[in-house]
Amino acid sequence: MPRHSKHSCSNSGKFSNYERQLLKYGTTTERLGKDSIKNFDSCSLCLNDVIMPVICNKGHLYCKECILTSLIDQKKLIKIKEKEWEQYQNKLKYEQDQKQEKQHQDSIKEFEKNVITLEGIGSNDDNNNNNNNNNNNNNNNNNNNNNNNNNNNNNNNNNNNTTTTTTTTTTTSDVNNKDKEKKEIVEKEIKLNSYWVITPDNKDKAIEKPRSYTVCPADGKHPLKSAQLINVHFTNVKPSSSDSNDSNNQYCCPICSKVLSNSTKTRLLKRCGHVFCSCLDKFKEDSSSQLSCYVCDKPYTEDEIIQIHSGGTGFSGSGSNLEAKKYTHTAIV
């Protein structure tokens, strides 16, 4: 749409740009604020403060009760979809068998029709030949001229028989072709739906084979089991801290005592479940020997560090998507 269509003078001055936005037709966009963004310490399912927090390998935080109920529901849904898929496969197999049987029966019927027509033609030829032979024997005793006449008659009879056989075969083939054309026309009429009437689809939708594993409900991409969940151990803010008056700031880093928020990149150790801020990287660089947790002294490797997923700070520089879109029908005004 060109830029001039947004002016108030477009479309005979009926609607201005502000009035069009009030209609809420077409694609509407809105900038998300800080209140619309999930906190790092809130559950990815219920969006409340976590109770008995657990985390997946990709850094999505959940309440233990929420994630377990979600995984159980996924297992139930998988069983239902597997039954539906099995029924659909049995239905396809049954339809395929029915088509093969029908084709086999049609081929048998066509073969029987051809055999019957050939038998009828052969019996008529035998009777005609016997009668002609008797007449020829009698006529041979009488006159040689009559023999010539009988031979001519036999030739005419044979020609008539061949014409009758060709006509019978052509008529049967024409009837079969007409029946096939009628069936095709009826099938097309069933498929054609009136565009102004709401009608259901004639064809059943194909059911794909369901997955046999549960996935993480936050993104739905990577598989997740209940045994893969990691218990999270946050460090509570001390009462002497200056930021303890804020109810949202509940947790801090055990190394630097910095209050954790969406602006701080929080990290978790996979073995013990303790949460740290970005100072864990500095602590990792300073230690030349084997890495160990600052709280419980458990050894860990760099691959066992998980970054906790957060919604962002509300600024565009955080890298998160801060624009929401809603698609509706366009208004012709």
From Swiss-Prot:
Biased composition (Low complexity): 127-175
Induction trigger: Down-regulated by Pseudomonas aeruginosa, PAO1 strain and PA14 strain infection and by growth on bacteria.
Record has Cytoplasm as a keyword: yes
InterPro entries, per database record: NOSIP, Znf-NOSIP, Znf_RING, Znf_RING/FYVE/PHD
Region entry Disordered, spans: 120-181
GO molecular function terms listed in the Swiss-Prot or TrEMBL record: molecular sequestering activity; RNA binding; ubiquitin protein ligase activity
Keywords, in A-Z order: Coiled coil, Cytoplasm, Nucleus
Coiled-coil intervals, chain numbering: 73-119
Compartment(s) where it occurs, according to its Swiss-Prot or TrEMBL record: Cytoplasm; Nucleus
Pfam families: Rtf2, zf-NOSIP
Disulfide pattern: none
GO biological process, one term: regulation of nitric oxide biosynthetic process
GO annotation, cellular component aspect: cytoplasm; nucleus
Function summary: Regulates nitric oxide production.
Protein family per UniProt: Belongs to the NOSIP family.
UniProt name for this protein: Nitric oxide synthase-interacting protein homolog
Species classification: Eukaryota, Amoebozoa, Evosea, Eumycetozoa, Dictyostelia
